[in-house]
């Protein structure tokens, strides 16, 4: 299940988290009550939606009784999700894709199953698609990339799948809970770190699709898919 929330009000939030100094650790390195957190996540305990599990920035991932759980915060936004261990793409209690002007990057929708949607691709350029296992080992498989419809930027298959899960491909989507916006559900701080100077401080949802695509490709190429919990 993926939730993205403001500290006063999911990662992703990362929806998406990038460049924030903080405390990142696997759950095995921290004194966490895995059983309690797992039970709260499985029951969609509203406490997880109302406040972070601890103060400050953190990033915890652990396996418990057949499921993988993830809890994170950049100190302002916080998120959590879980899925069956080893599952590829289907969160057990998932993020609902955004449509029109309501779009969770990581969100409050309960018991909605994420689906990967892959548009037909024509071979042009190749970029690696990272697939990360629970022990953080990464294997790369090739993905094709081509320009998005309405954009001249080459976007690889993996990013297109991320865009579908994050916003349904809606470039004007906005998550009213987390503030994440645009086709790739950027948080404003993340957007400002990769957007052209002209669009820094501007909501991603108000930027042209080609600008959003270019920013997403830049973020993906510099940090991989880890910026998106739905990846």
UniProtKB/Swiss-Prot annotation:
Tell me which InterPro entries the record gives. Lysozyme-like_dom_sf (IPR023346), RPF (IPR010618)
Q: What is the lineage of its organism?
A: Bacteria, Bacillati, Bacillota, Bacilli, Bacillales
Keyword Coiled coil assigned to the entry: answer is no
Under the heading Pfam families, the entry gives: Transglycosylas (PF06737)
This chain's protein is named Probable transglycosylase SceD
Positions of region (Disordered): 92-153
List, as start-end ranges, the regions of compositional bias called Low complexity: 119-137
Which top EC class applies here?
hydrolase
Membership in a protein family: Belongs to the transglycosylase family. SceD subfamily.
Biased-composition ranges, Polar residues, are 96-116, 138-153
- Regulation: induction: Positively regulated by sigma B factor.
- Hey, what's the signal peptide range on this chain? 1-27
List where in the cell it is found.
Secreted
Q: What Enzyme Commission number does this protein have?
A: 3.2.-.-
What is the purpose of this protein? Answer: Is able to cleave peptidoglycan and affects clumping and separation of bacterial cells.
Its Gene Ontology cellular component terms are: extracellular region
Give a GO molecular function annotation for the protein: hydrolase activity, acting on glycosyl bonds
Database matches in SUPFAM superfamilies: Lysozyme-like (SSF53955)
UniProt source species: Staphylococcus aureus (strain MRSA252)
UniProt keyword list: Glycosidase, Hydrolase, Secreted, Signal
What's the superkingdom here?
A: Bacteria
Parts forming coiled coils: none
């Amino acid at each position: 299940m993926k939730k993205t929330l403001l500290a006063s009000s999911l990662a992703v939030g990362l929806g998406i988290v990038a460049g924030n100094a903080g405390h990142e650790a696997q759950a095995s390195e921290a004194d966490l009550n895995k059983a309690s957190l797992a039970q709260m996540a499985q029951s969609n305990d509203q406490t997880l939606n109302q406040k972070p599990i601890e103060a400050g920035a953190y990033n915890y991932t652990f396996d418990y009784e057949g499921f993988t759980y993830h809890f994170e915060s950049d100190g302002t936004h916080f998120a959590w999700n879980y899925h069956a261990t080893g599952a590829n793409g289907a969160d057990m209690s998932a993020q609902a894709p955004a449509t029109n002007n309501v779009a969770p990057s990581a969100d409050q929708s309960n018991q909605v199953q994420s689906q990967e949607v892959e548009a037909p691709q024509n071979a042009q350029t190749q970029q690696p698609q990272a697939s990360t296992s629970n022990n953080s080992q990464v294997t790369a498989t090739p993905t094709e990339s081509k320009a998005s419809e309405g954009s001249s930027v080459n976007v690889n298959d993996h990013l297109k799948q991320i865009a579908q899960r994050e916003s349904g491909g809606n470039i004007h989507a906005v998550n009213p809970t987390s503030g994440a916006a645009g086709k790739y559900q950027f948080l404003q701080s993340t957007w400002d770190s990769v957007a052209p100077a002209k669009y820094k401080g501007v909501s991603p949802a108000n930027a042209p699709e080609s600008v959003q695509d270019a920013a997403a490709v830049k973020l993906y190429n510099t940090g991989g898919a880890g910026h998106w919990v739905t990846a």
